[in-house]
């Protein structure tokens, strides 16, 4: 079954920070993902255009319950940033070695995060190459959430960073992409068929879709 859908985003102009924060504050999962897609992540001299994201909802009794989300079972010290305010960086460690980045969205007290899955390096190529010395193709420098974290050098020290403050160690410049495609999220075992992964189809940095071998269909989960 083909779950992919496509559309056109509204603008390629960098938004005013207050406008962006307000949009993220009011956003639901799909809206938040489309806001973040096409934005530029800035960490030191490295600038990376975000070409693939995934939306994750929140608690099981919240407005957009998502069993694949870190916040589904409630607030913890680890997922605190997901509960707001909007526009902050949620960093977590994956498999004990990779650092993955998310953008918080939604009202304060309501959990939500947009996972940054892949990007194209615009500036700071020498820095990124030094961090990823075994990778020879630029399109692969920041392909996949763990590799994107490695390319930026972000660690748990940046967890909670305010992405739209000028003095933040990690900043996000929002300019929506000219086009997008959506489909199921990668590697999740629950809510696997939700088309909450968004990507820019012409980008060579987008990762390949992989369905989790443990994934259940919507009917199986309800049964």
UniProtKB/Swiss-Prot annotation:
Pfam families: Pur_DNA_glyco (PF02245). SUPFAM superfamilies: FMT C-terminal domain-like. CDD domains: AAG. One of its GO terms (biological process) is base-excision repair. Keywords: DNA damage, DNA repair, Hydrolase. GO terms for molecular function: alkylbase DNA N-glycosylase activity; DNA binding. Its EC number is 3.2.2.-. Belongs to the DNA glycosylase MPG family. PANTHER family: DNA-3-METHYLADENINE GLYCOSYLASE. This is Putative 3-methyladenine DNA glycosylase.
């Amino acid at each position: 079954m083909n779950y992919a859908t496509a559309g056109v985003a509204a603008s390629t102009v960098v938004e005013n920070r207050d406008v962006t924060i307000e949009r993220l504050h009011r956003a639901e999962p799909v809206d938040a993902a489309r806001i973040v897609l096409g934005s530029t992540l800035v960490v030191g001299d490295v600038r990376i255009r975000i070409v693939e994201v995934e939306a994750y909802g929140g608690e099981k009794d919240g407005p957009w319950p998502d069993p694949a989300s870190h916040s589904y079972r409630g607030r913890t010290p680890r997922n605190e940033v997901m509960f707001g305010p909007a526009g902050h960086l949620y960093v977590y460690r994956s498999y004990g070695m990779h650092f993955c980045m998310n953008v918080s969205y939604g009202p304060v007290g309501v959990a939500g995060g947009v996972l940054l899955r892949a990007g194209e390096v615009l500036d700071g190529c020498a820095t990124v190459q030094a961090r990823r010395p075994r990778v020879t193709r630029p399109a692969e420098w920041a392909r996949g959430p763990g590799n994107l974290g490695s390319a930026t050098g972000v660690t748990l020290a940046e967890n909670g960073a305010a992405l739209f403050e000028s003095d933040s160690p990690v900043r996000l410049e929002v300019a929506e992409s000219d086009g997008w495609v959506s489909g199921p999220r990668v590697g999740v075992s629950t809510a696997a068929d939700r088309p909450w992964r968004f990507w820019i189809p012409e980008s060579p940095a987008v990762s390949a879709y992989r369905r989790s071998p443990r994934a259940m269909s919507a009917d199986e989960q309800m049964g």
